[in-house]
Amino acid sequence: MNLYEFTFIAQQGLLQQEVEGMAQELGVSLKNIKADIMFQQIKGILEKGSDKFTKRDSEMHAKDIQENLIAYSSFLESFAKILWIELEEDLSNLKEVKLKISKELKDDLKGLGIAQGFIKLPEGGKQIAKNAFIHNAVSALKEDISKHLIKIFQGILQNFGMAEPNQSNKTLEMLLDNIEASGLIKYEYWGLLDFAYPINKMKSGHYCIMCISSTSNIMDEFVRRIKLNENIIRHLSVHVDKFFEGKSHMMNKQVEEQSA
């Protein structure tokens, strides 16, 4: 699970709500990219595993596996977002956050057959950073998910001559890499700000930062598509260890300047 702070500058002619809408659309784009990568990865594995099936057969089975992966992935997204947004830095409100997860994701937990025992503090009262705690919780949940998915996969993989336990486990492990990518966790609009020098003859632009949990291959494709977006004139992707809590440094600085 990689964390990124992705900052983009949108054209000055847009309205604030249009820029914020763009950030949300980019979040949807991350979901779609993940689904596309999953499908292509699954199809490639199936096609290499057997030459007895047509391209249509491979695509049909790949779609079945993809749908199961997306269901679990969507749950992981919701789970991770609650932890990142609601959990205090010192984990002091963990009990309340666990109740929120149980309440909001109750139907998903039941429908996906997931037991609620994956959010645990370190033994012996050891201190742990919030980002490390979330990573451990997501990894534990991912392991629980893999136990359910292997049962689904084995039947499909058997048709492709890939039902050996070790081979099935390796295939599943490869496919599970992308489901940890939670996508857009939160975003922050910084406002219409002046440039130090003109960019494409423009003197100002709308600044927005997105906090993203993703994999490198998903982010590579995301950035490639960003470059095709005519409304975005500049962008910067930075790999970080953790997301900022509350407001970003940029927003706090703006508040200080306005108060001075």
From Swiss-Prot:
One of its GO terms (molecular function) is structural constituent of ribosome. HAMAP family: Ribosomal_bS6. Keywords: Ribonucleoprotein, Ribosomal protein, RNA-binding, rRNA-binding. This is Small ribosomal subunit protein bS6. Binds together with bS18 to 16S ribosomal RNA. The lineage of its organism: Bacteria, Pseudomonadati, Pseudomonadota, Alphaproteobacteria, Rickettsiales. NCBIfam families: S6. The gene is rpsF. It comes from the Bacteria. GO terms for cellular component: ribonucleoprotein complex; ribosome. One of its GO terms (biological process) is translation. It comes from Wolbachia sp. subsp. Brugia malayi (strain TRS). CDD domains: bS6. InterPro entries: Ribosomal_bS6, Ribosomal_bS6_sf, Ribosomal_S6_plastid/chlpt, Transl_elong_EF1B/ribsomal_bS6.
